[in-house]
């Protein structure tokens, strides 16, 4: 089973997405542990994210120590999840190139990564600055989120940056590395793998609301297409991390408000 599953990737681009018969093919071709991971990513992960977001948004104020605890626990959770996914992927015979961890032309990949990261950083920062002066419901929701969850001190910014880097590495490995490799191994074509992995990525971000989930899914289409075209997750890892870093820094700057020292003293911690 180990070697056979890894070899399935060779003919993946020839697969057809043909309704019930194709779904039956997926069910029979994908190992049980991969299905378990897929169900976890599609059901448990979105539920966990929405519940945590609902909890924090219901609070009139979130203390600095609570934000740092949130950042740290999320970092730990993502690395643990990525480690489990990697364990099962390698146990089933998936290779580094199949997972997007090796291959492609380094010069092209580095150039694409640099140009993309620069454009993403500038565009995302400018968009958040533009939204700051708006009373649109999306801007109001972002403002409420920034006041509670975005970094408001140097210590928080360090932890948030580590969280952004973790999300870039772990989420891209899981959704663009493992998920796409698993779908290829089950016989999906490239376009089907792009769509399904992007739907899963969007659903995993339901805690951002319907609009945020849809936008994340659309972004996932771009990221998945780049991963397949260049046989590497490196560009999208960097782009994802840049998006999150800019969201935290620009969001805190244009939407957040500084937590009061008195509130943190009452919480027992002043950073």
Locations of the language-model features?
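Transmembrane helix-loop-helix hairpins at the membrane interface
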Residues: 38-46, 145-271
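Juxtamembrane helix-loop-helix connectors linking adjacent transmembrane helices
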Residues: 21-23, 61-68, 90-167, 185-186, ...
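N-terminal start-of-chain detector that recognizes signal peptides
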Residues: 58-60, 69-73, 134-140, 173-174, ...
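N-terminal, membrane-interfacial amphipathic/helix-forming hydrophobic leader that caps
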Residues: 2-108, 192, 248-271
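Short helix-terminus and kink motifs of transmembrane alpha helices
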Residues: 50-55, 128-129, 177, 181
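Hydrophobic alpha-helical transmembrane segments of multipass integral membrane proteins
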Residues: 79, 83, 118, 199, ...
